[in-house]
C-alpha cells in the first residue's frame, strides 16, 4: 500500500476544519497508509522567529530517512490538480521513500525546515490559515489519487 505522511504544526481547533479534515483523511486511508504527525505549537509568548525555530526543531526531529519532505509554503511551486497528480506519481512509485508534506504553524516554516525540503509547494498565491491549508492539501491528495485511478471524483 502506498504511504503518505503529513507533519503539521498544531491540532485542528475549529470544528468545521476538523470535520472536513477527518472526511478527507477517511477517504485517503482507503488508498494509502496515512501517517499524520502533529507537532506541538511553539510558545505563543515568543517572538515569531523564535517560535518558528522552536517548531522547526520539532519538525526536523520528527523527520525520518524515508520522508521525502515537501514544504508547504506560499513561495513554492503551484500546480493544477492534474500537474499535482503527475508530480506525486514518481514519489508513490518509490518503495523506499514516501511523500511527507510539512505544514507550518501561524508563522510558517523555519529556514531549517525549508533546508530539509526536496520540494516546496504552494496551494495558492494567496495565504490561507494553516487549518484551511491542511484541509485543502488533504482534498488535493485525494483528488490526485482519483485522477490517477480515473475515478469520477475529478471532472
Curated annotation (Swiss-Prot):
Give the protein's biological function. Answer: Specifically methylates the pseudouridine at position 1915 (m3Psi1915) in 23S rRNA.
Question: Main localization of the protein?
Answer: cytoplasm
Keyword hit for Cytoplasm: yes
Assembly and interactions?
Answer: Homodimer.
Q: What is this protein called?
A: Ribosomal RNA large subunit methyltransferase H
In which residues is S-adenosyl-L-methionine bound? 104, 123-128
* Annotated Gene Ontology cellular component terms: cytoplasm
| CDD domains for this protein | RlmH-like (cd18081)
Family, per entry: Belongs to the RNA methyltransferase RlmH family.
List the catalysed reactions.
pseudouridine(1915) in 23S rRNA + S-adenosyl-L-methionine = N(3)-methylpseudouridine(1915) in 23S rRNA + S-adenosyl-L-homocysteine + H(+)
Spell out the coiled coil positions from the record. Answer: none
Entry GO MF terms: rRNA (pseudouridine-N3-)-methyltransferase activity
UniProt EC number: 2.1.1.177
Keywords for the protein's UniProt record, in alphabetical order: Cytoplasm, Methyltransferase, rRNA processing, S-adenosyl-L-methionine, Transferase
Where in or outside the cell it occurs: the entry states:
Cytoplasm
One matching Pfam family: SPOUT_MTase
Amino acid at each position: 500500500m502506498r504511504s503518505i505522511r503529513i507533519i503539521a504544526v498544531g491540532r485542528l481547533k475549529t470544528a468545521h476544519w476538523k470535520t472536513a479534515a477527518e472526511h478527507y483523511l477517511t477517504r485517503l486511508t482507503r488508498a494509502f497508509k496515512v501517517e499524520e504527525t502533529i507537532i506541538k505549537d511553539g510558545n505563543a509568548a515568543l517572538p515569531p522567529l523564535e517560535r518558528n525555530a522552536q517548531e522547526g526543531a520539532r519538525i526536523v526531529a520528527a523527520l525520518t530517512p524515508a520522508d521525502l519532505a515537501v514544504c508547504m509554503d506560499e513561495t513554492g511551486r503551484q500546480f493544477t490538480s492534474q500537474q499535482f497528480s503527475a508530480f506525486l506519481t514518481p514519489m508513490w512509485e518509490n518503495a523506499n521513500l514516501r511523500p511527507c508534506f510539512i505544514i507550518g504553524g501561524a508563522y510558517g516554516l523555519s529556514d531549517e525546515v525549508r533546508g530539509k525540503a526536496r520540494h516546496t509547494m504552494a496551494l495558492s498565491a494567496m495565504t490561507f490559515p494553516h487549518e484551511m491549508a491542511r484541509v485543502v492539501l488533504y482534498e488535493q491528495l485525494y483528488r490526485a489519487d482519483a485522477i490517477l485511478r480515473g475515478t469520477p471524483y475529478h471532472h
